[in-house]
């Protein structure tokens, strides 16, 4: 059954990663002005990352998200093959944006004197996973399994493309309420994936692994698995397991809801204190709890269409 589901879900991750050298996006300042191509709508959210507005592409009325990032807030920079210096977020998004539905797509970008503007796809109707859980409480395990599989596939896709997200959390996952598909968003804390140790971290602390809290060092893949464990706990219990550094370092997991023993086992495995004791992505997908995953459309029909959609974001 798992093999058939893998084959059915293959479209979510089978397409190749975007090739930076093959990209057809011209540098932002060589294109028509932003204002002539996009109509800017209401503010969707703001924070340390900048501000995100809803918008419409004038040419075809496509809904988009328009993200403004001030240059003086950008800590990590990258370079495109043509030598253009851009935020690392642009480099990472261009690597992961092609041929895969589980990661938000970068449609365009513009450089301004004091900022960069990123044009991103915007599904409708949509709600982030944080708001979804806040409104509806802990998820049924069948729904959590479908969501978790999709997030896992998105993270695997990123790693296959040489990208480490570094801020996997419920607020950075969008749910397309019509299609039952999830999308990983916000690569502002991301980095190029490497096998050596990382000594910097700009993600969300309560999702960070104990080795970062204790030693300010971590490896990308095992840290991602820890964050996935936090996320799965959040899905099935309705809240994260740890709030303080001491709790993260101690790593004792208590379940506040009735959760199956198989799901508990997977969560505890992902939250192993020793990074080398955590499962690989393949081991997670082969875990007994991960069998019989609903397809996204099945998820929408069974779990989402019967619910009144929350506010769009």
From Swiss-Prot:
Its EC number is 2.7.11.1. The modification Phosphothreonine is found at residue 23. The active site is at 167 (proton acceptor). One of its GO terms (biological process) is positive regulation of TORC1 signaling. It comes from the Eukaryota. GO terms for cellular component: cytoplasm; nucleus. The keyword GTP-binding does not apply. It is an enzyme of class 2 (transferase). It is found in: Cytoplasm; Nucleus. Keywords: Apoptosis, ATP-binding, Cell cycle, Cytoplasm, Kinase, Magnesium, Nucleotide-binding, Nucleus, Phosphoprotein, Proto-oncogene, Serine/threonine-protein kinase, Transferase, Ubl conjugation. The modification Phosphoserine is found at residues 8, 98, 261. Its main location: cytoplasm. This is Serine/threonine-protein kinase pim-1. It comes from Bos taurus (Bovine). The gene is PIM1.
